[in-house]
Amino acid sequence: MDPRERVPPGNSDEETVGEAFAWLERTITELNRVAVNHLPRELIFQVWQRSWAYWREEQGMSISYTKYRYLLLMQKAMFVHYTKGCRCLQEGHGPGGWRSGPPPPPPPGLA
């Protein structure tokens, strides 16, 4: 067996998977903390709610997969925001008040 294809000593598959889940949680939390300075909080909540409703409830995917899909959507939203010329820290942004009723539960890191 090629030594490059072996798992390094002290790294079992369970540890690697656990590290991936921990990374996903840390990344989502950090992304949400940054995104709240650039995108309306309501938009972030809506992306979280719709990701959960579609990927978890409708498609029956795992919680980690749902979080991963949310992460991809938010990364894309932040990328588009920055490429359009971010001026949020100088000018700020509105609350995104297009939705009536109570706000949805917050995503991880914004509770």
Swiss-Prot record:
Binds to human NUP153, as annotated region: 60-79
Motif (Nuclear localization signal): 64-71
Function according to Swiss-Prot or TrEMBL: Plays a role in nuclear translocation of the viral pre-integration complex (PIC), thus is required for the virus to infect non-dividing cells. Targets specific host proteins for degradation by the 26S proteasome. Acts by associating with the cellular CUL4A-DDB1 E3 ligase complex through direct interaction with host VPRPB/DCAF-1. This change in the E3 ligase substrate specificity results in the degradation of host SAMHD1. In turn, SAMHD1 depletion allows viral replication in host myeloid cells by preventing SAMHD1-mediated hydrolysis of intracellular dNTPs necessary for reverse transcription.
GO biological process entries: symbiont-mediated suppression of host innate immune response; viral life cycle
Subcellular location: Virion; Host nucleus
Gene3D superfamilies, A to Z: 1.20.5.4730
Quaternary structure and interacting proteins, as annotated: Interacts with the P6 region of unprocessed GAG. Interacts with host VPRBP/DCAF1, leading to change substrate specificity of the CUL4A-DDB1 E3 ligase complex. Interacts with host NUP153.
Keyword Nucleus (UniProt): no
UniProt cross-references to Pfam families, sorted A to Z: VPR
Cited InterPro entries: Lentiviral_Vpx_assoc_factor, RetroV_VpR/X
Gene Ontology CC annotations of this record: host cell nucleus; virion component
Recorded family membership: Belongs to the lentivirus VPX protein family.
Keyword Metal-binding: no
Gene (name only): vpx
Protein name per the record: Protein Vpx
Sorted UniProt keywords: AIDS, Host nucleus, Host-virus interaction, Inhibition of host innate immune response by virus, Viral immunoevasion, Virion
